């Protein structure tokens, strides 16, 4: 496995390589990331994993400075999974100008759900992913469903900007108690970690109610948010949306997703549950 730090070196490697599957990450890899890598390995012999903590997708007061940087440990895990290349550029390599002069602006989605609470986040995601797509030139790229809104943004930009890349969604990795795997779980105290699976349970409860012909979407959303608030969470949102577009759900929609974001102590957690109705 090679660890490559420059765009020029990666492009030289890419010239003589066939099909490539790509997994973009910010490092501090856990089992959820490795599940993406394993899916990528099924799709192509050559897998590239990027490790880059992208300043553009962090807002003021967020955890950019304390986000864990664990390149050597990550590289060891990826080597064991048969990854061909780790692309680990520094900030000046990916953003040679003091500021990124041109950005990819997602449409309405960047101001809804998580975008409402993290201004500029999805612009940062869309911009860095577009840059990485242009650098790596993958045939396939794998993204986790835990970041459901991010996945929708990536699907949209891939289609609208004519990237010839197959986007592969991968199911959310979970701990035994249901908590979605996340690099930020390490911020949780022991007590918070014990409480954290409640988020998934509340979303599951909403999903079950929807399957029982529960069309009072606002009531179900409010009930789940109230349960979380009563347990000490600070809720950003619980919302039921169309799974394909993340537009507001309406009666008659068959494929839905229940999404939530909430803070437990100082840690912001997100999760979602897909729902298929008959």
Curated annotation (Swiss-Prot):
The active site is at residue 33. It comes from Neisseria gonorrhoeae (strain ATCC 700825 / FA 1090). One of its GO terms (cellular component) is cytosol. One of its GO terms (molecular function) is pantoate-beta-alanine ligase activity. It is found in: Cytoplasm. (R)-pantoate binds at residues 57, 150. This is Pantothenate synthetase. Its main location: cytoplasm. Homodimer. The keyword Transport does not apply. Pfam families: Pantoate_ligase. Belongs to the pantothenate synthetase family. GO terms for biological process: pantothenate biosynthetic process.
């Amino acid at each position: 496995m090679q660890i490559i730090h420059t765009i020029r070196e990666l492009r030289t490697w890419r010239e003589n390589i066939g099909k490539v599957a790509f997994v973009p990450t910010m490092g501090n890899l856990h089992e959820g990331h490795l599940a993406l890598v394993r899916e990528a390995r099924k799709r192509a012999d050559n897998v590239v994993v990027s490790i880059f903590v992208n300043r553009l997708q962090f807002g003021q007061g967020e955890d950019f400075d304390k986000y864990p940087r664990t390149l050597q440990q990550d590289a060891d895990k990826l080597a064991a999974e048969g990854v061909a290349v780790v692309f680990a550029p520094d900030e000046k390599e990916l953003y040679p100008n003091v500021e990124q002069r041109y950005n990819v602006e997602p449409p309405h989605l960047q101001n809804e759900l998580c975008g409402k609470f993290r201004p500029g986040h999805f612009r940062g995601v869309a911009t860095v992913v577009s840059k990485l797509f242009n650098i790596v030139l993958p045939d396939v790229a794998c993204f986790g469903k835990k970041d459901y809104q991010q996945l929708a943004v990536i699907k949209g930009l891939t289609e609208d900007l004519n990237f010839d890349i197959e986007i592969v969604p991968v199911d959310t990795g979970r701990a035994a108690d249901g908590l979605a795997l996340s690099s930020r779980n390490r911020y949780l105290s022991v007590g918070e970690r014990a409480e954290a699976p409640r988020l998934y349970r509340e979303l599951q409860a909403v999903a079950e109610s929807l399957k029982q012909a529960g069309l009072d979407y606002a009531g179900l959303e409010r009930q789940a948010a109230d349960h979380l608030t009563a347990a000490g969470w600070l809720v950003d949102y619980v919302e039921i949306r169309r799974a394909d577009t993340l537009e507001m759900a309406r009666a008659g929609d068959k494929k839905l997703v229940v999404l939530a974001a909430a803070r437990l102590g100082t840690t912001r957690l997100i999760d979602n549950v897909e729902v298929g109705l008959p």
